[in-house]
């Protein structure tokens, strides 16, 4: 085996020993160093959801970055993906793989540096290839999903790690931690980039129904300004089950994309509201709860009442269709991804109100057949415009449709049309323009 320990292989062949940081790997007597102090996963939300994309390794004092390289560490993780795999795979030692390390540098906080260059500090940041299959944080729990509270990330320090020398540039400094084949597990909660910036609260309707929700205000939020708001309506499994609060932000990209110009292609400030309905009662009843929350929220924050938008994933479309039909004029535009079908009555109501809608769907969606859902919704709304006397050109401006071939999905979940949809900034800019 190479100097760089293959952690996934070691776990299967000999059973990797897992230890608590600070209990081993200390330097020799008189050599300084107290070993690894903490392991802190760092997560990001990508097109197909949240995953570990870096690890912060904390030492007792400032680390000498000149002694570090990508072979200094091995990071492995579970290959489990809630979209495809049984939940038992999470802890199966045969269902693990080493991650690809893309950068190693020091920092004074457990955070990423955009330039991937070292700053003086006691944290070593180990960045990982986000396209690796391992490191997903969301897990199934019955018919729902939640963020896994016990991430399976493991770190091995393959080479000695040294402190800064007493005189800069002279030697490598005292040893902080000796090389070892022992694996470290996370010792502190993950740092969840962007997801941790949301505020997570609960709202109770006038009829006593409780709904958790998350929201994000733009940096430098100014109550004297008016901001567009995008309401994220998540899939069935992201509904609230009593113990999975906040997963509607982590499971898919829509909630966090609006804070990132690399996704939207615009620097415009946007408020995001992400309700997490309990999956009880009809879609219409759930929509009523969501609308009461939205109206209350819009009254408390500086929302542009002419720029309220809905963006849905899968089952969230049923709430959007119901709200668009029942509360005409509430939403100024809607983006329906991988959704259920709008009924004929809903299509007529939507066309009557003239609310612009863009529908996207995967050609080979394995859960919702495209011909009876995405295509049907588009055709019903378009035909309703024809019945109301609109020209084809006018209808084409008010209802749009995009269908994605398999090649548009970098993970083989053709149901999650939100992934390729949100990778197309022109669609997001269209929504904000309504």
Model-derived features: where do they sit?
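Secretory targeting and sorting signals
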Residues: 1-26
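A domain-start/cap signature at the N-terminus of enzymes
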Residues: 27-54, 70, 77-227
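Gly/Ser-rich "nucleophile elbow"/oxyanion-hole loop immediately N-terminal to the catalytic nucleophile
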Residues: 220-225, 281-314
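The conserved beta1-alpha1 loop
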Residues: 228, 233-235, 338, 361-362
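Active-site machinery of serine-nucleophile hydrolases
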Residues: 229-291
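Short, proline-enriched alpha-helix->beta-strand connector loops that line the catalytic pocket
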Residues: 268-270, 351-357
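Primarily recognizes the serine-hydrolase "nucleophile elbow" in alpha/beta-hydrolase
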Residues: 299-300, 306-351
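C-terminal catalytic histidine-bearing segment of alpha/beta-hydrolase fold enzymes
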Residues: 347, 360, 364-368, 372-375, ...
């Amino acid at each position: 085996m190479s100097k760089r320990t293959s952690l996934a292989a070691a776990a299967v062949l000999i059973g990797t020993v897992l230890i608590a940081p600070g209990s081993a790997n200390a330097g020799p007597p008189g050599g300084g160093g107290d070993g690894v102090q903490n392991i802190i996963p760092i997560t990001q939300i990508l097109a197909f959801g949240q995953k570990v994309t870096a690890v912060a390794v904390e030492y007792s004092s400032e680390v000498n970055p000149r002694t570090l390289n990508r072979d200094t560490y091995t990071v492995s993780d579970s290959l489990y993906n809630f979209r495809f795999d049984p939940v038992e795979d999470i802890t199966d030692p045969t269902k693990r793989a080493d991650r690809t390390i893309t950068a190693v540098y020091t920092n004074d906080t457990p955070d990423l540096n955009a330039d991937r260059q070292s700053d003086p500090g006691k944290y070593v940041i180990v960045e990982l290839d986000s396209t690796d299959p391992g490191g997903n944080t969301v897990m199934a729990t019955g018919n729902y999903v939640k963020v896994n509270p016990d991430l399976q990330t493991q770190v091995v320090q393959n080479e000695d790690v040294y402190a800064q020398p007493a005189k800069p540039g002279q030697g490598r400094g005292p040893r902080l931690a000796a090389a070892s084949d022992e694996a470290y597990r996370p010792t502190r909660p993950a740092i969840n980039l962007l997801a941790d910036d949301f505020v997570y609260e609960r709202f109770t309707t006038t009829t006593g129904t409780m709904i958790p929700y998350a929201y994000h205000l733009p940096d430098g939020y100014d109550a004297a300004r008016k901001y567009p708001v995008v309401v994220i309506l998540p899939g069935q499994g992201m509904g609230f089950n009593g113990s999975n609060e906040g997963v509607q932000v982590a499971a898919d990209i829509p909630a966090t994309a609006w804070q990132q110009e690399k996704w939207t292609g615009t620097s415009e400030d946007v408020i995001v509201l992400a309700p997490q309905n309990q999956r009880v009662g009809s879609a219409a009843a759930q929509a009523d709860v969501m609308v009461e929350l939205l109206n209350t929220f819009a009254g408390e924050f500086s929302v542009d009442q002419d720029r309220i938008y809905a963006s849905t994933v899968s089952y969230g479309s049923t709430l959007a269709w119901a709200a668009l039909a029942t509360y005409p004029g509430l939403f100024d535009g809607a983006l329906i991804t991988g959704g259920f079908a709008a009924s004929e009555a809903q299509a007529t109501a939507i066309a009557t109100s003239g609310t612009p809608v863009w529908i996207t769907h995967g050609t080979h969606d394995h859960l919702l057949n495209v011909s009876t859902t995405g295509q049907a919704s588009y055709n019903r709304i378009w035909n309703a415009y024809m019945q109301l006397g609109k020209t084809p050109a006018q209808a084409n401006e008010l209802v749009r449709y995009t269908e994605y071939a398999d090649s548009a999905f970098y993970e083989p979940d053709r149901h999650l049309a939100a992934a390729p949809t949100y990778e197309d900034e022109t669609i997001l800019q269209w929504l904000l323009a309504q």
